[in-house]
Amino acid sequence: MPASLIDGREISALRRNELKQRVQHHVGLGQRPPGLAVVLIGNDPASVIYVSNKRKACEEVGITSHSYDLPAETTQEKLIQLINELNQSDKIDGILIQLPLPKHINERTIIEHIKPEKDVDGFHPYNLGRLAQRNPFLRPCTPLGIMNLLHHYELNVKRKHAVVIGASNIVGRPMSLELLLAGATVTICHKFTQQLQKFVEIADFLIVATGKMDVIATDWLREHQVVIDVGMHRLPDGSIRGDIDFKKAVEKVAWITPVPGGVGPMTIVTLLENTMMSAARLRE
């Protein structure tokens, strides 16, 4: 029997509608619309598409998107100067720096210059530290979006074994913290993990964020599993797929996210929700 689909498009649409009403209520109280600064350095095609989608999503819910498109040769000093200005601006509630950055700019340095209360990506060490200490505020968008998906479908991770494949600062590590916060027993696998198959086979929840296709063989999967595929790869024919072979996996597991249409839409709506949360807090 094919797996049940975890539909990120449907759930993100519901959450966007709820958020739109919250923004309208916020403005109805005499506040300006929440403001999100979206900073793009260079013209990487994938980044341009991602930024365009985020700006469009802002418009749909009533958040004001402030665009800062900088040339690829922008210096680190110039970027920090812009961030400092955005930190001080009373029109900006959230700051998003589109990653990856050009090689001459230090990603960690840039993230640490963003005010934690405007760090709507949730990457600042302060915000990650709060998550680790079980007192989160602004949380990384993809992991939180995944947790919201699981919650909607009543897929409870408490007392279950969750295996995270990938240990990036953006997904893998904060994902493990979210799962731990929710009461799961968590195993993190990475490029140095031995006997990866063994960990995959014993997972109740499998979150795959390797950035590579087919690291996880389909015959490792089990019929009771919930599989969350964070990967996104564009194939030569223009189609998009995830880290896992969806067509095979959907016939083996209990629940699975499609790619596209699974995790991606939830990441964007969570970014908008973080921006609204930041705006509300900055008004307190």
Swiss-Prot record:
Residue sites binding NADP(+) per the record: G166, A167, S168
The protein's annotated pathway: One-carbon metabolism; tetrahydrofolate interconversion
The reaction(s) this protein catalyses: (6R)-5,10-methylene-5,6,7,8-tetrahydrofolate + NADP(+) = (6R)-5,10-methenyltetrahydrofolate + NADPH; (6R)-5,10-methenyltetrahydrofolate + H2O = (6R)-10-formyltetrahydrofolate + H(+)
Gene3D superfamilies: Leucine Dehydrogenase, chain A, domain 1 (3.40.50.10860), NAD(P)-binding Rossmann-like Domain (3.40.50.720)
CDD domains named in the record: NAD_bind_m-THF_DH_Cyclohyd
Assigned GO CC terms: cytosol
Domain of life: Bacteria
Swiss-Prot/TrEMBL keywords: Amino-acid biosynthesis, Histidine biosynthesis, Hydrolase, Methionine biosynthesis, Multifunctional enzyme, NADP, One-carbon metabolism, Oxidoreductase, Purine biosynthesis
EC number(s) from the headed UniProt entry: 1.5.1.5, 3.5.4.9
Sample GO molecular function, one term: methenyltetrahydrofolate cyclohydrolase activity
Biological processes, Gene Ontology terms: L-histidine biosynthetic process; methionine biosynthetic process; purine nucleotide biosynthetic process; tetrahydrofolate interconversion
A Pfam family per the record: THF_DHG_CYH_C
Family in the record: Belongs to the tetrahydrofolate dehydrogenase/cyclohydrolase family.
PANTHER family: C-1-TETRAHYDROFOLATE SYNTHASE, CYTOPLASMIC, C-1-TETRAHYDROFOLATE SYNTHASE, CYTOPLASMIC-RELATED
Primary role: Catalyzes the oxidation of 5,10-methylenetetrahydrofolate to 5,10-methenyltetrahydrofolate and then the hydrolysis of 5,10-methenyltetrahydrofolate to 10-formyltetrahydrofolate.
Assembly behavior: Homodimer.
Name of the protein described by the UniProt record: Bifunctional protein FolD
Source taxonomy: Bacteria, Pseudomonadati, Pseudomonadota, Gammaproteobacteria, Legionellales
